[in-house]
Amino acid sequence: MAYPQLTDKPGALETAAAIRSGALSVAEAVDAAIVRLEKLDGPINALAVPDFARAAATAKAMDAGGPDPDKPLWGVPMTVKESFEVEGLPSCWGHEKLKNYI
């Protein structure tokens, strides 16, 4: 089954293939995702807790190690819902009482 292309931007599968082939680095993919988020997220405020510095550092480390063929989406940028606990980031689940829970 083919997946419909909803935008002119490459999806996760295309991005993963470009990273595996060496046509795109993880750092380039992350940088592009950050630029797009900074440009488009303002009015909708979908990104509750940006962690761009850690994303960029992780991308550099991943590029230094090379692709993992056993992980099909290796290196593809993604976001994590703030209700999942991530070390060093708040997880308030949208509740004001939990705004300082880290």
PLM region descriptions:
Residues 33-34, 47, 66-67, 98-101:
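Broad hydrophobic/π-residue packing in well-ordered secondary structure
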